[in-house]
Amino acid sequence: LDLTPGSHVDSYVEA
């Protein structure tokens, strides 16, 4: 899981 700020995952997790 790529939980780095601005990653593809964080893109919709913190949206």
From Swiss-Prot:
The GO biological-process annotations, alphabetized, read as:
neuropeptide signaling pathway
User: What superkingdom does the record give?
Assistant: Eukaryota
Q: List the disulfide bonds.
A: none
Task: Offer one Pfam family short name for this entry.
Answer: Pea-VEAacid
This protein's GO CC annotations:
extracellular region
GO MF terms held by the record: neuropeptide hormone activity
Q: Which UniProt keywords apply?
A: Neuropeptide
- Name assigned to this protein: Peptide hormone 2
Show the InterPro entries listed in the entry: Pea-VEAacid (IPR012593)
